[in-house]
């Protein structure tokens, strides 16, 4: 073969190979594009059609230069759709309470900007717990903190932070309020916020960050609500509200709310004589509240709420060891399951209790006449027997000589049961402590446990001599 023939032969072979490579590239390109659009076709819904997100298997072909690699399998993870809470699990069996959280707000305010607050509480969404309080529109180290012992001003707002985070300057102000309640229905937060003139206040109902409904004071005498969490079952939330005399006959109503809209209002019925500042918990299929009688009884009123037919039944905690302050000492106190005990009935403090079969768990101040110290215990047959005074599983939360304040309950749903937790308000400043001109609080939080636990005391702990006056 002469040189010219060799050149022609090599050229022909090269041209043939180039042509084959060219067609291979086109085939690979067509295959890749076809697979891409087929995947889009299988995974995209038609226009205007809602497609539910479900776990699916997606095949993706990855092309690198001209080589088609192995097919990989990837599992798409879809977010779980939000559902209304129904609280149908049983109550957890507990032996007592274990420490959970403490915010140390007053101690921290000695060196930083922390809000002046009172009336704190805790409530949880399905994932996290949050602490709430009514701010006074000022920080402690601010001259506006003078005379913040006042309950109702137009500057008070509802504050909300993740539990354990003190109310710093970056804290969200949820609404304007000098009385409030909050709860999560499984999809969004509901906030009940009361503000305005004592004789013509407004309650705003804020759901998912939007004002949905409102109601005006019906008795023109300081409309007020729970100062702790409300409860939602299957999308219906209940909140107890009172308007009228603080030491006499008042007008209490239970409001039923769906996504922020008031759908029904029931009047208090039953034997409770005076109901304020209820601490409520889910007791499927209804809601149960233990409240404050500021008129006749140092035994606490009970309000049972039927979600389905909106009926209300009220009575009193039977236990011969009573839970309000002031009260008689335990050796001389008495109780009644239906009526107030007419012992040290005037005044009072927000508190809590919950049933455990025929027994009752409760918390109260250790001092019988003032808001000092805090203890919890179980009264055997305390839910059914007015003569019951057998106290077991007692725990000291705050020593007798240290200040306490309001306390309330909140519920946390676990995998198999619903746990009960409580918080204690640790008030500092005026009127009792005159070294400073302000009144504020921190909190300590405990939750039910089926395990073992030790002893201690968890007071506020701030040295007011180191604080802003």
Regions found by a protein language model. Give the residues of each.
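Beta-rich carbohydrate-recognition and catalytic domains
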Residues: 79-113, 118-129, 133-173, 184-223, ...
């Amino acid at each position: 073969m002469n040189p010219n023939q060799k050149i022609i032969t090599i050229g022909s072979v090269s041209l043939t190979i180039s042509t084959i490579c060219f067609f291979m590239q086109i085939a690979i390109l067509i295959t890749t594009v076809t697979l891409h659009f087929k995947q889009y076709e299988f995974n995209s819904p038609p226009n205007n059609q809602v497609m539910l997100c479900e776990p699916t298997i997606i095949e993706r072909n990855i092309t690198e230069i001209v080589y088609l690699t192995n097919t990989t399998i990837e599992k798409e993870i879809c977010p779980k759709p939000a559902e209304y809470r129904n609280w149908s699990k049983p109550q957890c069996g507990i032996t007592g309470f274990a420490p959970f959280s403490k915010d140390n707000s007053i101690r921290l305010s000695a060196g930083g900007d922390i809000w002046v607050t009172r009336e704190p509480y805790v409530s949880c969404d399905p994932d996290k717990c949050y602490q709430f309080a009514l701010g006074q529109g000022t920080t402690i180290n601010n001259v506006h903190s003078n005379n913040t012992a006042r309950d109702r001003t137009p500057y008070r707002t509802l504050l909300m932070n993740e539990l354990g985070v003190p109310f710093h300057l970056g804290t969200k102000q949820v609404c304007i309020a000098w009385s409030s309640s909050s709860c999560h229905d499984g999809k969004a937060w509901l906030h009940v916020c009361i503000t305005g003139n004592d004789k013509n206040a407004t309650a705003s109902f804020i759901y998912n960050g939007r004002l949905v409904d409102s109601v005006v004071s019906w008795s023109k005498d300081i409309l007020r609500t729970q100062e702790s969490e409300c409860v939602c079952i299957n999308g219906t939330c209940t909140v107890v509200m009172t308007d009228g005399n603080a030491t006499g006959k008042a007008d209490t109503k239970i409001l039923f709310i769906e996504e922020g809209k008031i759908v029904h209002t029931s009047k208090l019925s039953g034997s409770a004589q005076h109901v304020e500042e209820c601490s409520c918990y889910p007791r499927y299929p209804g809601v149960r509240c233990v409240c404050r009688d500021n008129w006749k009884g140092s035994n606490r009123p009970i309000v049972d709420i039927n979600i389905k037919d909106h009926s209300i039944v009220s009575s009193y905690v039977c236990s011969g060891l009573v839970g309000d302050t002031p009260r008689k000492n335990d050796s001389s106190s008495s109780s009644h399951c239906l009526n107030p005990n007419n012992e040290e009935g005037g005044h009072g403090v927000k508190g809590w209790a919950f049933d455990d079969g025929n027994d009752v768990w409760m918390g109260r101040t250790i001092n019988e006449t003032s808001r000092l110290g805090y203890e919890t215990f179980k009264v055997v047959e305390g839910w059914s027997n007015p003569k019951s005074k057998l106290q077991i599983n007692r725990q000291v939360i705050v020593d007798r000589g240290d200040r306490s304040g309001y306390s309330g309950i909140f519920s946390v749903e676990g995998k198999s049961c619903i746990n009960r937790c409580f918080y204690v308000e640790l008030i500092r400043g005026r009127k009792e402590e005159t070294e400073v001109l302000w009144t504020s609080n921190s909190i300590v939080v405990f939750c039910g446990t089926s395990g073992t636990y030790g002893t201690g005391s968890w007071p506020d702990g701030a040295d007011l001599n180191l604080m802003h006056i």
